[in-house]
């Protein structure tokens, strides 16, 4: 019994002694962070070089208090938009940082490949970068469209503004290959060949960079022959929990409406075209006079089937924070967009084109040990697209092709009217042909660990990353036909018949797995000479 008590006391002393030694090995310093105008800087990160376990952030008054290991003599202060500053400190004396604005961004870290970061001032490759704060200024449902005009060397062509289909075709420094000209998309250091960049929430993006020269091929191989688009999402920082809520409402309008001739002018030109072909005029002088003075009905089909404006709403909630052990950022977003095409809901379905998009992003960084840390990135996007059975291209063609002299678009009792030689009237294409419900899901998950081998030689580390990407696309179609009636001299006669809905479904799923492992060496000698290499 006596031996057991002695053993237990030894164990207790061992653990308490370890904590006492740890406490004795730590010191506490305090200070303040200001800019050139002597204004306090909130959220500045202060840490001990090469020892991320000892890190803190400044408060709204620019003040900070932090623990430091025994023997440390230097601390470094960083904040976006300012040059990094390293200072030597003395115990029991406040540390006063005065940060200088970094207009040229020389101390900005660029993520050039596989989570490897380089200081902008030291990177020699051809690269262009835009910060996420600039991208959120453009209220666009498609993320790729927000890059237009913001990155030198990036050519973007947008051929449609249809909700959920307004992505741009992008080229970096023109057309480069006969096998394909699409640049490689890299999301947080992981190549993402299946990733639909158009669905990305701009509120989650820290920066976007493009690699434009041979350096891209050296880093990513033949897949980067047309350049690389590097997307870096936001991460949590040390400090108190921050909650940001963003809401915006925007209006989408056509930049220019088509100029359409009047019904009377159309009738005259139609007759002239028939005469030029040796035919018989279609409209009498009496009808032309009626179309001209308005006694006979005429239509501007663009004005009939197109709304003046369409709305888009975006909602976003962002929660971030962290400490020396765990840093986190969680973002949830919702987007709703309507279409300019005017559709009518019926008893069986709603053919109106609408986009519902849900985005969830969660980035977590964990320091497991002084020499070991890990991260987990999760990005999920869900698109729900509801629209009529026919695409917007067919509808717009029908609007432009349908003669303004055709009555309608429906009779008083709801019958669809068309011309004798127009089998698919615009009203029927929009409201009576059926529907499609499309669901798209993008999932990107990455997990990685970094082992600092500084205890062997300063600046040496090894890292391993596994990335998983999955893409699902499924569509439910409900197709039908409908009765339509063409006007002739004696009244209306029916063509086609109304059919019940016929349902069908298509679905496909793809996935991509990426493994990365490399050794990194980064060290500064003499305060001036830097060596950075990885395999």
Label each residue range with its predicted role.
Residues 2-8, 18-361, 374:
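Short, small/polar-rich motifs associated with maturation and membrane association
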Residues 13:
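Predominantly soluble domains enriched in secretory-pathway, periplasmic, or organellar proteins
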Residues 243-247, 330, 376, 447, ...:
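Membrane-embedded beta-strand positions of outer-membrane beta-barrel proteins
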Residues 254-256, 295-333, 337-340, 351-425, ...:
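Flexible loop and strand-edge segments within Gram-negative outer membrane beta-barrel domains
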């Amino acid at each position: 019994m006596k031996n057991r008590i002695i053993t237990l006391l030894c164990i207790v002393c061992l653990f308490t002694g370890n904590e006492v030694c740890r406490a004795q090995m730590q010191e506490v310093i305090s200070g303040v962070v200001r800019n050139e105008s002597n204004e306090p800087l909130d959220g500045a990160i202060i840490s001990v070089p090469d020892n991320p376990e000892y890190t803190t952030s400044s408060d709204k008054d620019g003040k900070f208090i932090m623990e430091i290991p025994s023997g440390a003599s230097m601390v470094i202060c960083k904040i976006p938009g300012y040059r990094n500053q390293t200072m030597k400190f003395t115990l029991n004396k406040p540390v006063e940082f005065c940060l200088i604005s970094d207009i040229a961004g020389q101390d900005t870290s660029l993520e050039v490949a596989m989570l490897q970061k380089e200081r902008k001032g030291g990177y020699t490759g051809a690269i262009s970068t835009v910060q996420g704060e600039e991208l959120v200024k453009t209220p666009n449902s498609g993320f790729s469209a927000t890059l237009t005009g913001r990155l030198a060397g990036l050519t973007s062509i947008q051929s449609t503004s249809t909700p959920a289909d307004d992505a741009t075709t992008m080229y970096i420094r023109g057309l480069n290959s006969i096998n394909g000209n699409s640049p490689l998309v890299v999301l947080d250091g992981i190549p993402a060949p299946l990733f639909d960049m158009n669905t990305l929430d701009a509120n989650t993006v820290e920066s976007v960079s493009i690699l434009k020269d041979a350096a891209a091929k050296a880093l990513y191989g033949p897949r980067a022959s047309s350049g690389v688009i590097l997307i870096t999402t936001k991460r949590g920082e040390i400090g108190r929990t921050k909650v940001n809520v963003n809401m915006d409402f925007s209006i989408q309008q056509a930049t220019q409406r088509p100029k359409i001739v009047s019904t009377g002018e159309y009738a005259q030109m139609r007759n002239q075209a028939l005469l030029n072909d040796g035919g018989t005029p279609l409209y009498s002088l009496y009808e032309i006079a009626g179309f001209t003075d308005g006694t006979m009905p005429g239509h501007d089909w663009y004005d009939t089937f197109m709304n003046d404006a369409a709305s888009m709403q975006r909602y976003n909630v962002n929660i971030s924070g962290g400490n020396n052990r765990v840093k986190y950022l969680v973002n949830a977003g919702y987007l709703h967009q309507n279409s300019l095409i005017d559709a009518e809901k019926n008893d069986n379905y709603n053919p109106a084109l609408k986009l519902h998009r849900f985005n969830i992003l969660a980035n977590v960084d964990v320091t497991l040990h002084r020499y070991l840390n890990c991260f987990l990135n999760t990005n999920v996007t869900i698109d729900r697209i509801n629209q009529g059975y026919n695409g917007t291209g067919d509808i717009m063609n029908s609007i432009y092709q349908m003669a303004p002299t055709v009555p309608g678009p429906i009779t008083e009792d709801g019958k669809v009217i068309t011309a004798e030689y127009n089998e698919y009237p615009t009203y029927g294409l929009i409201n009576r042909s059926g529907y499609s419900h499309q669901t798209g899901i993008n999932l990107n998950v990455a997990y990685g660990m970094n082992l600092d081998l500084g205890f062997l030689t300063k600046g040496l580390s090894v890292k391993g990353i596994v990335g998983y990407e999955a893409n699902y696309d499924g569509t439910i179609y409900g197709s039908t036909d409908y009765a339509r009636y063409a006007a002739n001299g004696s009244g209306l006669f029916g063509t086609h018949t109304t059919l019940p809905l016929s349902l069908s479904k298509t679905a496909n799923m793809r996935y991509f797995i990426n493994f990365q492992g490399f050794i990194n060496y980064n060290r500064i000698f003499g305060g001036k000479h830097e060596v950075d290499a990885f395999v």
